[in-house]
Amino acid sequence: MDENREVQGTPEADRRPVVTIGAEQLHQATETLQRYKQGKTNLEKRVIDNEEWYRLRHWACLRAESQKQQVEPVSAWLLNSIANKHADAMDNYPAPNILPREPGDVEEARRLSDIVPVVLQQTGFERTYSEVWWDKLIGGTAIYGVFWDGSKLGGLGDIAVEPVDVVNLFWEPGITDIQRSADVFYVRLEDNAALERAYPQLAGNLGGSTLNVSAYVYDDTVNTADKSLVVDWYYKRSGQSGTELHYCKYVNDTVLYSSENVGTPWYDHGKYPFVFDPLYRIKGTPCGFGYVDIGKGTQEYIDRGDQAIMANMLSNAAPRFFIRSDGAVNEQEYADWTKPFVHTNGNLGQDSILPVTGRGLSGIYLNVLEQKIAELKETTGNRDVSTGGSTSGVTAASAIAAMQEAGSKLSRDSNKAAYRAFREVVELVVELIRQFYDAPRQFRIIGESGRQEFVIYSNEALRPQAQGVAFGVDMGYRVPQFDLEITAEKASPYSKLSQNELALQFFGAGFFNPQMTDQALACLEMMDFDGKEQIMQRIAANGTLYQRLLMVQQQAVAMAQLADQLGGTNYAMQMLGGGQAGQQPMPGGVPDIKADGGESSVTRNARETAASRATPT
């Protein structure tokens, strides 16, 4: 999407044609790209093989060319583990909460907390989040690309957050942080006709590239003869304001766009627009390894064991016979069970035809196979309790909940890592808003009361702000900075039910009674749950309002007593009899919410607790 950035335009004075990136620089960049590609050859091969394992086509990786006719059973134990991990991730879909660092940025942080989720929704981030999680579980690495797409909204431009395939991205070998790479290359195949329409200078210059990228094994026949590799080259240079990020888009030896030639850095934040989220880290690379790498060895032995058992079953199920060469039996008629007569020549002896006696497998082989299945579940953290089941003999709800809590530790750990990557994504989104949201835009948000609200927003409050003059010294400019708090949307129905029941328990305990404000706040300080701060603020506000009401009533009674003394009226007694608030009764009869299926409250509470504990805090 970065290639559309240039439609934003810059003043002509800032677009002086300073030719810094030319054919020679492109040749050097391509050599660097080739060196980077050689450095990640093993990674690309592993990722492509893992994709075949995920698609249950791993026999293509196991069998030899001479064994294509063998029995090839495929079991989906590893796939089931990956699918459950993906479901856990989507049940804990992240939501950003932007917090100010200075008192003057409180209002802007609140507005960003409302607008950033809308921006992510408009760019289809939920689908991106799902795609990168598949990449993370299968290949071991999820990569986000946070770009500015100048073609969106009729040329106004907007943010694009997309999944990036690790096969198409190249960086300096040996580094762990992508931001420390000297150069980063993002390579994609694009249609020649589309390129010539967008860039007329490419006419007759396409084809003959020495570059190539690794490809997956597709179901369809993919013809790349009419396609060319387009390289997005990102690199950093030292500038007046510090480290500057530059961008060059080229095909073969033709420059399509160069920010350095234009004379303006690409993104003001100065970072590569890529965020890595590895599952299990590996030293010396920003990538990691996934569940396919962990479980494919065990899955191989499971399928090979199934292969031996199935081959034995088929050989024993189909009758076979020994036939003497001089037995004079018509083999075709004997093998055809529909023919009642079988012709023979001469005498038929007892040893002319003998059935082949098969041998059944011992039960120990089935036991080993079951142990391998249990090993795969154990090593991938996909035991029965984590998928809603329980081991034999365990029926108590508290015991099941305890096992589910222990089984969700791996999910909580991987979700926390995903939230750290999501925090970096949101930081880049805020920086792009700071740089490009010059024109006011309108957003539909959900207000505090749950109603739709329409707000107009621009980056005016995010731009550098003058701090004035103090003691004759210019204090310069301040750039508003924010902290990010990542929480999980309650996608699990049991988590939602648990949150709703907690609110009813607060209501039943009188937490929202303004006369019990101090007791309620003291109790809440000892508790820990999502949204605790908002509840405490609401209860404190109710208590403050109640105290003010009492003060107003006392002043009104005093004024009424004074009026009674002067005019002989009885206003004070009337106000004391019907105007002063009395002790409010404790709420009672709070209805009990039952889960579908009429299960007991003990079981329901245990399941809700287990569902909420799967959410990282």
Task: Tell what function each PLM region has.
Residues 1-11, 107-307:
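Extended, regular secondary-structure scaffolds
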Residues 81-82, 142:
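Small-residue-rich
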Residues 73, 85-112:
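Nucleic acid-processing catalytic cores of prokaryotic defense/repair systems
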Residues 1-70, 136, 144, 151-154, ...:
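C-terminal anchoring/interaction modules
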